[in-house]
From Swiss-Prot:
InterPro entries: Herpes_ICP4_C, Herpes_ICP4_N. The keyword NAD does not apply. Residues 262-277 have a biased composition (Basic and acidic residues). Residues 415-426, 803-815 have a biased composition (Pro residues). It comes from Suid herpesvirus 1 (strain Kaplan). This is Major viral transcription factor ICP4 homolog. It is found in: Host nucleus. The lineage of its organism: Viruses, Duplodnaviria, Heunggongvirae, Peploviricota, Herviviricetes. Belongs to the herpesviridae ICP4 family. Residues 101-112 have a biased composition (Acidic residues). Residues 25-59, 73-493, 801-987, 1385-1446 are annotated as: Disordered. Residues 883-892 have a biased composition (Basic residues). Keywords: DNA-binding, Early protein, Host nucleus, Phosphoprotein, Transcription, Transcription regulation.
Length: 1446
């Protein structure tokens, strides 16, 4: 603001006169001498400062008087200078009457012990004592009042009219006292920013509050003499004269009223007080020497009182008598003001230096120095020093309140301490002080200081003054002050906008990359992914970005703005911009004017004054933020779209019902077209164009409820003209949907549903043909393919027959791919500019549009797991390059370690293996190192382009086996076969049903040794499985196809169990060393819970049934022998296998039993017809009381059972259905311990199958201790002294020798029913007798025993709880079991007899001890030598010493 004022004065032509007047005033002031001289000489000597800062100066409140002062100064500048006096010649010229402005950077701390340290008020007095004044930086807020002006004191003496609190304008003008004409009316204020006087009453003309009667004139001069403190004149504050009859006195009354009634200007240049109007040669530097003599310059802190909330930060004022203001931190100097604020002052005579009013002209609260206090002799130093001490204490206490400044920090240096005060010395009155004596009154308490404010550092302070209320809603967007935006002017020739407002850089028009990018920008129909100003006018880019934001699904535009898809030319150009544009101009956080590469510089929008152009910048800023998630960003985007809708669609804003009427008219147009249809043969191209138009409308409508109406016409009644009209109406309807109301959107949804149901027979109920006709996506998939197959796919896209030309008047078949109607040849497509297929402008919206139909269905069903046709039922875009994160090996390259069985794949299938991406579960395993494309040179694409042999075509068909469904699919082709009628499970999507693989391709894919021959037809029922086969080989494919080896012949399958394993649970895979282990989930059951239910045992984290403890694959041979097939949702051909079994057995009039345990049904899962038996249950690990209530010891072996969860109840339903369907077959036994065997680590070996039969146990254990004389080794090998059971399985030697190592204890099932299981909240809900029965029951391992199921009301009928009885000795009755770290001893209920040992009193459970660190409590065992143990189980046990080892 100071620079603007300086330029204004200089341009107005008054600055030369001011310099001349200041020089003349300086010479006359020196000639008058320090002793005073005549009154006229003092006035002439002070006119140089009064011209700027005096009561009638240019920066005072009296603008009219300022004009008179200018004229008087110009007239007096021609007088010859008066020679200096003798006294003045003796003093140095430098320290005589000098006023120095001290900048922030020139501050220094006072020396320790200096009296002036931290006392700006003291420094002020010293400066006035020696006849000079130094102005320091202003403070935040001042507490001192504003002293009266000389004119006010003169008016008080003369009794000027106007009543109390008012003064005459003429009396307040120093120009009028010297003969210059003064204003006779209310003074006008001059605004430097506007340049015209403002007709506003000055501070003297405003009403004041009534003041007390005037006091004697002798007291008015007391503050000027700065005498000792007295009760009437306290040293801590100034003395005021509240009733002076004229202008307010130096008290706080005038300052307070002036601050309350004065309206500040918005652009008031308070910073101009730091400017020096003298020539550079006439300025004197600042004296900061602390050891200078009495004639040296003394720095004085100068106060500026804050002017309201819009205070300028460069204001400067003179400290009043009330003490110095609080200190503030030095602020950083702005660019360009260092030379003007380097501590240079205004030279004048000693008397005029105090006489002139240096308070800011626009600071209403700034105190002014009274004339009587300024014009005093040098002998008043003793009295003023005491007053200065009082001011020093006040200023230091107030300075501590400022933030960021340490208490007591000095503002400026002061001279040496003054001499002791001389009370007898009286000040010599001057002419001015004698004539301006006024009455004095007791001084009021000083005003409290304002709280400190945080300093603003904005260089454009006028832009921060926001007006109240919203900006104008029409017209150009201007600043809050109604001005053009700063920095929006066009840059200089040869430069372009870059960086902050007004900044620029050199242009790069001559670069080849820039010229090519400009050509692509001119040819592009949408926004380009990288834009710089050299590419041309940014209006096209801004408008394209706005269209992009309002088109497509929510969030896609934001994603593209943040990370636009770039082709190779755009990527090279982006790298060029990073290297040549951004890198030379700063770091990553440097202000560039745009957030992302597609955005033009924001200065273009500011210059155009178009608020709509700010929308892409706001959306990009939100997209780049990391403080919001995707949903929150979508909300902000929708808010911006709604806020800018009136500007983006001005027609709708003018007429609120314009868009709604358009939607209604278009919907009526659709129905009218069907009503006026004429029969005729409809080309397939027109039907596909109608399908694409329907998709565009649905994309704008989603989410919107849809209904299925009846077709409007039969397919034979539709003609070409009808479809042309319907397609045109749909395309117009798509553009009219944004801004429509809910009712109109529902009407549009009904219309597009009517069109779809009517045209569906023409496209054979599939949209794949329409998607395949979008040749742009064929080119895009080819261009984004890997380098080794990109050329072949590009040639195939060029050879693909394109659609027919649309009829006249019909909209383009690909409305979102402008400029591409007929596929171009391969060379032209390879070098196509950005406006052609796959470029940045069309990528965001089109990617979402064309893949929206298949993304919701085929992606989850597994179609996305391959490349090309394997990822889509048609030739749609290939998502594999976007998701491919790991490198792939080259075609035909062999992975090390795959084994000889990899050779089972045909050569064609091997060549097509490496181009798809793998699922996460397929990439884990021991083989983790793979060859990649980067290890060798890429294959030459030229032979692929030139070759047209059948082998190349067959190779490509094997890589991309899926295509659209033909009119008559071959019976042995690969496609989904869903039975007609009702199904137990959801039907697959239309995209999954439309996928088709030709029979010869399907045979080539499935005829491999990896797949059993009898199960190969099941793979042809699943096109997704064929796509996976085309992209995989080796161990990953073999693991997923291992389910086929459970049952050799599909005819033998009776029951299919569907399950969804937990992560890292594998039924047919060996756990690899170092592979991640599954995590226990008490709320969700997986493979472990299912197998435990079949094995009639508990599944806890420490049991053998938990997959985390497996060291090998489990054995389910007993289940498979009964015709039970376990099929995982992750198995290869999961959906096709179920549908194949349903189809094959249904054709043989046999029903299949399907036991479904999957909680989250996969998308496009198998469809099970209602002809077969379907049982739906769930796996619930919390059904085990040990998991549900871990603290309940008495129910540790109990399991809650219901027909809705996997257990004996649901198994009974399956077994009953099996007995009814197969009456002559052996009954099912689904809950038996021998159904499943686990491979775990035991003392018999790291891979021990459990339960290990007793004979096998003895064969493994006894040879290791036969002949061994080390008793410790024998005890360790045989488990002597260990608990009989650990974690519910046989662990000790005697238990393993009887039931087998790892034989589990059987649980007790408690039947609760569906409702009872949900309502059971705690163990207290079960009867007490049931809990006691479960606590005492100990069911010994039995491979053939059926589950024991109890009901809460039938506990008494169950009899005594079952127990374990040792039959080899009468006193062996207790069983020791370890659970939860404690060893419990279980005794049967009737064990307390004659043979009972000491302490065996019949208690059911007794805790005898806690296992030690080695897991085995020490017992009183004597030395036992094992010589031989017979393995004959039928031998007589009596007298066998080896059975009595306990």
């Amino acid at each position: 603001m100071a620079d603007d004022l300086f330029d204004f004065i200089e341009t107005e032509g008054n600055f030369s006169q001011l310099l001349a007047a200041a020089a003349a005033a300086e010479e006359e002031g020196i000639a008058s001498g320090p002793d005073g001289g005549s009154q006229g000489s003092r006035r002439r000597g002070s006119s140089g400062e009064d011209l700027l800062f005096g009561p009638g100066g240019l920066f005072s409140d009296d603008a009219a008087e300022a004009e008179a002062a200018v004229l008087a100064a110009a007239a007096g500048a021609t007088r010859p200078p008066r020679p200096p006096s003798a006294q003045q010649q003796q003093q140095p010229r430098r320290g005589s009457g000098e006023i120095v402005v001290l900048d922030d950077e020139d501050e220094e701390e006072d020396e320790p012990g200096s009296p002036a340290a931290g006392s700006p008020g003291r420094a002020l007095h010293q400066g006035s004592e020696h006849g000079h004044l130094v102005l320091g930086p202003r403070s935040r807020a001042g507490s001192g009042p504003r002293p009266p002006t000389p004119a006010a004191l003169a008016a008080a003496e003369a009794g000027a009219p106007g009543g109390p609190g008012r003064s005459s304008p003429s009396a307040a003008s120093p120009a009028s006292s010297s003969g210059s004409p003064g204003p006779s009316a209310a003074p006008r204020r001059w605004s430097p920013a506007r340049g015209d006087p403002v007709g506003e009453p000055g501070p003297a003309a405003r009403p004041r509050t009534p003041a007390p009667p005037a006091q004697p004139a002798a007291v008015a001069a007391a503050p000027a003499r700065r005498g000792p403190a007295s009760p009437a004149s306290p040293a801590a504050g100034p003395v005021s004269a509240p009733g002076g009859g004229g202008a307010p006195s130096a008290g706080g009354d005038r300052g307070r009223h002036h601050h309350q009634h004065r309206e500040p200007l918005l652009d008031e240049p308070a910073a101009a007080r730091r400017l020096d109007p003298r020539p550079l040669g006439a300025r004197s530097p600042v004296s900061s020497n602390p050891n200078s003599n009495s004639n040296s310059t003394t720095t004085v802190a100068v106060e500026t009182v804050a002017r309201g909330p819009e205070k300028d930060e460069d204001g400067l004022g003179l400290a009043g008598d009330g003490g110095a203001p609080p200190q503030r931190q030095p602020r950083r100097r702005r660019a360009g003001e260092g030379a003007l604020r380097r501590g240079r002052g205004f030279s004048s005579s000693s008397s005029s230096g105090s006489d002139s009013d240096l308070s800011p002209a626009r600071s209403p609260s700034a105190p002014r120095a009274p004339a009587a206090a300024a014009r005093r002799s040098a002998s008043s130093s003793s009295s003023s020093s005491s007053s200065s001490s009082s001011s020093s204490s006040s200023s230091s206490s107030e300075g501590e309140e400022d933030e960021g400044v340490r208490p007591g920090a000095p503002l400026a240096r002061a001279g040496p301490p003054p001499s002791p005060p001389a009370p007898a010395a009286a000040p010599r009155p001057s002419a001015s002080s004698a004539s301006s004596s006024a009455a004095a009154s007791p001084a009021p308490a000083p005003e409290p200081a304002r709280p400190p404010r945080r300093k603003r550092r904005s260089t454009n302070n006028h832009l921060s003054l926001m007006a109240d209320g919203p900006p104008p809603t029409d017209g150009p967007l201007l600043t809050p002050l109604g001005e053009p935006w700063p920095g929006s002017d066009p840059p200089a020739d040869g430069r372009v906008r870059y960086g902050g407002a007004g900044d620029s850089r050199e242009g790069l028009w001559d670069e080849d990359d820039v010229r090519q990018a400009a050509a692509r920008y001119r040819a592009a129909a949408g926004p380009v992914p990288v834009f710089i100003p050299e590419m041309g006018d940014s209006r096209k880019q801004h408008e394209a970005l706005v269209r992009l934001i309002y088109s497509g699904a929510a969030g896609e535009a934001m994603s593209w703005l943040q990370n636009p898809r770039m082709q190779a030319p755009d990527q090279r150009f982006n790298q060029f911009c990073q290297r040549r544009v951004h890198a030379p101009h700063g770091h990553g956080s440097f202000i560039t004017g745009s957030v992302t590469p597609p955005l033009p510089h924001i200065g273009d929008a500011m210059a155009a004054q178009d608020p709509l152009w700010a929308l892409p910048h706001a959306v990009s800023a939100v997209a780049m933020s990391r403080r919001y998630d995707r949903t929150q960003k979508t909300f902000i985007l929708q808010s911006l779209r709604r806020a800018y809708a009136d500007m983006a669609y001005p027609g709708r804003a003018a007429d609120p019902r314009a868009g709604e009427a358009t939607v209604e008219a278009l919907c009526a147009r659709v129905r009218a077209a069907f009503a006026a249809a004429q029969p005729g043969r409809v080309p397939r191209e027109l039907a596909d164009a109608c399908v694409l138009a329907c998709r565009g409308v649905l994309e704008r409508l989603l989410p919107c409820p849809l209904r299925l109406p009846a077709p409007a016409r039969a397919p034979a009644a539709l003609g070409p003209a009808c479809l042309e009209e319907v397609t045109a109406a749909l395309l117009a309807l798509r553009d009219a949907i944004p801004g429509a109301g809910p009712a109109e959107r529902r009407q549009a949804a009904d219309s597009v549903a009517l069109v779809a149901r009517t045209v569906a027979p023409l496209v054979r109920y599939s949209v794949d043909g329409a998607r395949a006709r979008e040749a742009a996506w064929t080119y895009a998939a080819a261009l984004f393919a890997p380098a080794n197959v990109a050329a072949a796919r590009l040639a195939e896209a060029a050879a693909r027959p394109g659609p027919a030309e649309p009829a006249p008047g019909l909209p383009p078949l690909w409305p979102e791919q402008p400029g591409l109607v007929v596929p171009a040849p391969a060379p032209a497509a390879a070098g196509a500019p950005s406006g052609l297929p796959g470029s940045g402008p069309s990528s965001p919206a089109s990617t979402k549009s064309s893949s929206s139909t298949k993304s919701s269905s085929s992606t989850k069903s597994g179609l996305s797991g391959s490349s090309g046709y394997a990822s889509s039922p048609a030739a749609g875009p290939d998502p594999a390059p976007e998701r491919r994160k790991k490198k792939r090996r080259a075609p035909g390259a062999r992975r090390p370690g795959d084994g000889e069985e990899d050779e089972g794949l045909s050569g064609a299938a091997l060549r097509g293996d490496g181009h798809g991406h793998r699922d996460d579960e397929e990439d884990r395993g021991p083989r983790r190192k793979r060859r990649s494309l980067g290890l060798g040179p890429a294959p030459d694409p030229a032979p692929a382009l030139l070759s047209s042999s059948s082998s190349s075509s067959e190779d490509d068909r094997l890589r991309r086996p899926l295509g659209p469904m033909p009119e008559h699919p071959a019976p042995d082709g690969g496609f989904r076969r869903v039975p007609a009628g009702e199904t137990h499970t959801p039907r697959p999507s239309e995209a999954a049903l439309a996928a088709y693989c030709p029979p010869e391709v399907a045979r080539a894919l499935v005829d491999q040794e990896v797949f059993p021959e009898l199960w190969r037809p099941a793979l042809t029922f699943d096109p997704a499985a064929l796509a996976h086969i085309a992209a995989r080989r080796g161990a990953p494919l073999r693991r997923r196809a291992a389910w086929m080896r459970q049952i050799a012949d599909p005819e033998d399958v009776r029951v299919v169990v569907l399950y969804d394993p937990l992560p890292h649970e594998e039924l047919c895979a060996e756990p690899a060393e170092g592979a991640p282990r599954p995590a226990w989930d008490p709320r969700r059951g997986g493979l472990s819970a299912l197998l435990a239910a079949f094995a009639h045992r508990l599944c806890t984290p420490d049991s053998h049934a938990w997959a985390g403890n497996w060291t090998g694959r489990p054995d389910i041979g007993r289940l498979n022998a009964q015709g039970v097939l376990l099929l995982s949702a992750r198995d290869l051909g999961f959906a096709g296998a179920v549908e194949y079994l349903c189809s094959r057995l249904g054709a043989a009039r046999r029903r299949l039993i399907v036991l479904d345990t999957i909680e989250d049904w996969p998308a496009d899962g198998p469809a099970v017809g209602d002809y077969h038996v379907y049982v739906r249950v769930r796996l619930d690990p919390a059904a085990q009381c040990a998991v549900r209530w871990p603290g309940c010891r008495e129910l540790r072996a109990a399991v809650l059972d219901s027909s809705s969860i996997v257990g004996p109840a649901c198994f009974a339903r399956v077994e009953a259905s099996f007995a009814r369907l197969h009456p002559g077959a052996e009954p099912l036994r689904l809950c038996r311990q021998d159904n499943v065997r686990y491979t775990v680590s035991t003392r018999a070996g790291p891979r021990t199958p459990v339960p290990l039969p007793p004979r096998a146990y003895r064969q493994r254990v006894l040879p290791t201790v036969d002949g061994c004389k080390d008793m410790a080794r024998q005890r360790s090998a045989l488990g002597l002294g260990d608990p009989d059971f650990d974690a519910g399985a046989a662990f000790g030697h005697r238990a393993a020798n009887r039931w087998g190592l790892g034989a589990p204890l059987r649980p007790v099932f408690v039947s609760c029913g569906r409702r009872g299981l949900a309502e059971l909240r705690g163990p207290e809900g079960l009867p007490a007798e049931l809990r006691a029965f479960c606590a005492a029951a100990l069911l010994e391992p039995d491979a053939e025993a059926a589950p024991l199921v109890l009901t809460p009301g039938a506990v008494a009928a169950a009899g005594a709880p079952p127990a374990v009885l040792w039959d080899f000795a009468p006193f062996e009755t207790s069983v020791r079991a370890a659970a939860g770290g404690a060893v419990e001893t279980h005794r049967p209920a009737g064990a307390s007899g004659a043979g009972a040992g000491p302490g065996e009193d019949g208690d059911s459970v007794e805790i005898v001890g806690v296992r030690g660190g080695d897991g085995r409590p020490r017992g009183p065992l004597g030395p036992i030598k094992v010589e031989a143990i017979s393995d004959d189980e039928e031998a007589e046990d009596a007298g066998n010493p080896y059975l009595l080892l306990r």
